[in-house]
């Protein structure tokens, strides 16, 4: 027996299959683990409501197709609106000067959080924060456009995966200094 659904994590009810309403992908049945070794608190949290919470946010279409939008920890909540960091990163990667991009939440007094983009650009190419913001404004709703752009080498694992947790630390440290 196995069951996969896109559920609202607060109500544990299925989200509408409209291709727009985001929920969390959850599993139950013989396709899940029994729990975390010697960590009952983490097991209890992961299996809230009798379902394994994947941490992946997705939409479901009328035909049942599930499309992953982002990780729950990477969603930016700005003025009550959910912003997918992946959606913003996709737009940034389409800029001809960008070779690597990552977007994380930056604390904001007015909006709660706003997108902050970290970019690596091609050697010898001059691009400004204004250039990047103008590019984003052409492809994204205004509230999704990064308010801050940081240029430089991105921290990566030995396999080349961008370490967003390191970028979140940088943003947190900058926010603490600004206070």
Where is each model-derived feature located?
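Conserved ATP-binding loop and adjacent catalytic segment of the adenylate-forming AMP-binding
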Residues: 1-3, 11-23, 32-34, 48-49, ...
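AMP-binding/adenylate-forming catalytic core of the ANL superfamily
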Residues: 4, 23, 29, 34-35, ...
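General small-molecule cofactor/ligand-binding pocket signal
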Residues: 5, 149-152
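Active-site loops of AMP-binding adenylate-forming
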Residues: 8-11, 39-42
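Short, solvent-exposed loop/turn segments that connect beta-strands within catalytic domains
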Residues: 9-13, 110-111
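Short, flexible helix/strand-to-coil boundary loops that buttress conserved ligand/catalytic motifs
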Residues: 37-40, 47
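N-lobe entry segment of adenylate-forming
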Residues: 130, 134, 174-175, 179
């Amino acid at each position: 027996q196995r069951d996969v659904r896109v559920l609202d994590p607060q109500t544990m009810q299925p989200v509408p299959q409209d291709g727009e309403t985001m929920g969390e992908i959850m599993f139950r049945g013989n396709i899940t683990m029994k729990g975390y070794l010697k960590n009952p608190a983490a097991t209890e949290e992961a299996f809230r409501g009798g379902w394994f919470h994947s941490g992946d946010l997705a939409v479901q279409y009328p035909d049942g197709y599930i499309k992953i939008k982002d990780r729950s920890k990477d969603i930016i909540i700005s003025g009550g609106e959910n912003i997918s960091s992946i959606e913003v990163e996709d737009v940034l990667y389409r800029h001809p000067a960008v070779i690597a991009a990552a977007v994380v939440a930056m604390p904001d007094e007015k909006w709660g959080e706003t997108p902050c983009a970290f970019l690596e650009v091609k050697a010898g190419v001059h691009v400004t924060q204004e250039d990047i913001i103008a590019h984003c404004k052409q492809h994204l709703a205004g509230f999704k456009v990064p308010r801050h752009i940081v240029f430089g080498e991105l921290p990566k694992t030995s396999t080349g995966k961008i370490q967003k947790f390191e970028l979140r630390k940088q943003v947190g440290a900058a926010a603490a200094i600004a206070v």
